């Protein structure tokens, strides 16, 4: 196994990104069957950090940031074969570093709730979500 290298930038082969999402289980919660939407998600992210094992994409963080106050970490994915090696922790560290003084905020996948306290996150009790299909719905 070679050393993991890290890069910043969103100029990535979409097929590699989709394949990574599939192999990390994040694909279960992302529109990987909609290439145009996935491309838009990738290109409009203001901060993307990737992890590479030689030429294989093994991890990614995809964030939206103002680089001053808030960085929303939209996606954290690490290939299942490469988990439990500190790659996720390092991707988060590099995302935080690149985000300047911004606070990193995320919504956890249900199966990852126990992970985030181990990498320095504290749970916030008053987060709210408004999905696109509920906008303006008064129910």
Predicted regions span which residues?
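Short amphipathic alpha-helix that is part of the acyltransferase structural core
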Residues: 1-35, 127, 137-139
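A conserved beta-strand-loop-helix scaffold within acyl/acetyltransferase catalytic domains
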Residues: 31-32, 36-76
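Conserved acetyl-CoA-binding loop-helix of GNAT-fold acetyltransferases
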Residues: 78, 84-97
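Conserved catalytic-core motifs of GNAT/GCN5-like acyltransferases
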Residues: 105-107, 117, 122-139
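Residue-level recognition of the GNAT/N-acetyltransferase active site
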Residues: 9, 79, 109
């Amino acid at each position: 196994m070679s050393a993991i290298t890290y890069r910043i930038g969103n100029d990535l082969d979409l097929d590699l990104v989709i394949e990574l999402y599939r192999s990390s289980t994040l694909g279960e919660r992302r529109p990987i069957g909609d290439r145009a939407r996935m491309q838009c998600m990738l290109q409009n992210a203001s901060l993307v950090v990737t992890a590479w094992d030689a030429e294989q994409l093994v991890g990614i963080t995809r964030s939206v940031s103002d680089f001053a106050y808030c960085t929303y970490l939209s996606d954290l994915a690490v290939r299942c074969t490469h988990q439990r090696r500190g790659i996720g922790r390092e991707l988060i560290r590099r995302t935080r570093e690149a985000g300047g003084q911004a606070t990193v905020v995320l919504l956890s996948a249900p199966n990852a709730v126990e992970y985030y306290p181990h990498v320095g996150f504290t749970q916030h009790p008053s987060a709210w979500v408004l999905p696109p299909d509920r906008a303006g719905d008064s129910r």
